[in-house]
């Protein structure tokens, strides 16, 4: 009895905070990585001096809204960063954090081309007055050699486009929910204007309008009677099937490009009957894809 009571008094097990150190060569994609991590739900601190990392971890653990994921981007922009992170990692070993190090690399040729394209000097080249771009890259590579050797994951971005780097980071540091594509199906009425945030717009005004059926007019496309009427019209189901196939192709392309959000606008005259019914039906079809998180929004419902 006493043993059971003692067990019930034990504090619940707290999951260690995920902590990620992001470092690497200037021009290798550190800012892109930071943006991707933010999209994945990480709290990202950029260009933090090494001396403050341990303190920031402590504050993150002590705060009322305890962070679950913290990433710190550190590179040679911080003049206090000499390339030695061993002592930082040692300090973190005593804290309830799961620490990993991500290192981004790229070839000298690619880094030179990237710096020339954006017309910026390398942080270690002295703006061109004290050294060349190639010398700055070489100095940084030498300075970060130990960090690279200690990294849990090294990504060479030489041949990667931004969306390909995003995919690698999502695979390594995201979860199933983060990798799910967010799709919004939005009904609207053309007489109120096109939705400003729509990626795709389809027009279902080719279907007969339930507005002219007295017993259906008061109801919306969410009602069974209106839905059955709209979907029973010639071409309605064929249109849904064809448009769904088109969306499958489009969504696959969005995923390849690293896009995680899509808004599909379905319009009729007033946004009350046809667009509502067709949006619900389209969302139902899309919802069968486990890789999509689908929601329906009826923008103009109730405006009449």
From Swiss-Prot:
Disulfide links within the chain: none
Alphabetically ordered keywords of this record: ATP-binding, GTP-binding, Nucleotide-binding
InterPro entries: P-loop_NTPase, RapZ-like, RapZ-like_N, RapZ_C
Keyword set includes RNA-binding: no
Keyword ATP-binding found: yes
Family assignment from sequence similarity: Belongs to the RapZ-like family.
NCBIfam families on file: PRK05416.1
Function field: Displays ATPase and GTPase activities.
HAMAP family cross-referenced by the UniProt entry: RapZ_like (MF_00636)
Protein name: Nucleotide-binding protein RHA1_ro07174
Organism (species): Rhodococcus jostii (strain RHA1)
């Amino acid at each position: 009895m006493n043993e059971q009571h003692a067990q019930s008094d034990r504090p619940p097990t707290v999951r260690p905070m995920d902590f990620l150190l992001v470092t690497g060569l200037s021009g290798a994609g550190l800012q892109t990585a930071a943006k991707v991590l933010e999209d994945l739900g990480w709290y990202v601190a950029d260009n933090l001096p090494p001396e403050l990392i341990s303190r920031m971890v402590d504050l993150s653990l002590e705060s009322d809204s305890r962070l679950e994921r913290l990433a710190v981007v550190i590179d040679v922009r911080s003049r206090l960063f000499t390339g030695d992170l061993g002592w930082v990692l040692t300090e973190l070993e005593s804290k309830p954090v799961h620490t990993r190090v991500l290192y981004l690399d790229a070839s000298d040729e690619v880094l030179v081309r990237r710096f020339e394209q954006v017309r910026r000097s390398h942080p270690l080249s002295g703006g061109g007055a004290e050294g060349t771009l190639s010398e700055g890259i070489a100095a940084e590579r030498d300075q970060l050699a130990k960090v690279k050797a200690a990294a849990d994951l090294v990504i060479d971005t030489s041949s990667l486009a931004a969306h390909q780097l995003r995919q690698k980071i999502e695979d390594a540091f995201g979860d199933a929910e983060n990798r799910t594509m967010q799709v919004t199906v939005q009904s609207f009425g053309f007489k109120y204007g096109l939705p400003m945030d729509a990626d795709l717009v389809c027009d279902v005004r080719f279907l007969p309008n339930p507005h002219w059926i007295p017993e259906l007019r008061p109801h919306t496309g969410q009602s069974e009677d209106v839905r059955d009427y709209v979907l029973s019209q010639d071409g309605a189901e064929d249109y849904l099937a064809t448009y769904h196939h088109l969306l499958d192709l489009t969504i696959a392309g969005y995923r390849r490009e690293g896009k995680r959000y899509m808004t599909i606008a379905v319009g009729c005259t007033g946004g009350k009957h046809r667009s509502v019914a067709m949006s619900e039906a389209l969302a139902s079809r899309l919802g069968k894809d486990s890789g999509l998180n689908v929601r329906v929004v009826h923008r103009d419902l109730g405006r009449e």
